[in-house]
Amino acid sequence: MSNILHRVGTLDEVASKAFRVRKTCNKMLLKRGFNIDEEDIDMTTEAFISRFGEKPSRETLTILAENKEDVSDRIFVFFPEEDKVGVKTIKMFTSRMQQENVKKAILVVKINLTPAMKSVIREMSTSDGNSFRLEYFKDSELLVDITEHTLVPEHIVLTPQEKKTLLGRYRLKQNQLPKIQLSDPVARYFGLIQKQVVKIIRVSETAGRYVTYRICV
């Protein structure tokens, strides 16, 4: 036990960041409705070192999860090793996705992607006949779980049926709903796509509990 504590005390900054980022990724997938082992959500630094080592390779941090409601809906989380991710790396990931019949992936990169690489990912995600959906986050965006911040209200993504029921109940057209941008940090956290609706629950000392809805644009 003392050896473990000693190693934790000397855990370098890179490994510490990897621990925090991977833990946030698991929490994010859980809140998106994917099955995540409880041990991954509650993982301690000691458990992380035991599983991945003191200087983990980013490749070993890869996550593969399936949706609680639809086991065919699976998602990868990849952690590229290189600082500047290129087309070769993206193609390596999409090749693995094809082999394992996985349509969604999140890339967790060390630094921001170049505009050219962002364009490549957009094209790969929207090309005719290509059903991949690729998202990306920087390490620095996942050091903490933004949904756990006291100023961020609870967000719940509505199913298509729940959205239909909402619009029918209030006799609304979807363009009459308040909007949330695709680029909004919380929208990105939940992996929202255009026209999805999110329910936002706020708690106020003066107004009590109140609910609003926003549509992703």
Where in this protein do the model-derived segments appear?
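Helix-rich terminal scaffold detector
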Residues: 1-103, 115, 119-131, 140-145, ...
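Long beta-strand-rich cores associated with HINT superfamily self-processing modules
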Residues: 153-158, 162, 166, 206-209
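Short, structured beta-strand/loop micro-motifs enriched in basic residues and often containing a Trp
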Residues: 173-184
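Short, surface-exposed secondary-structure boundary micro-motifs
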Residues: 202-203
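Short, compositionally biased
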Residues: 208-217
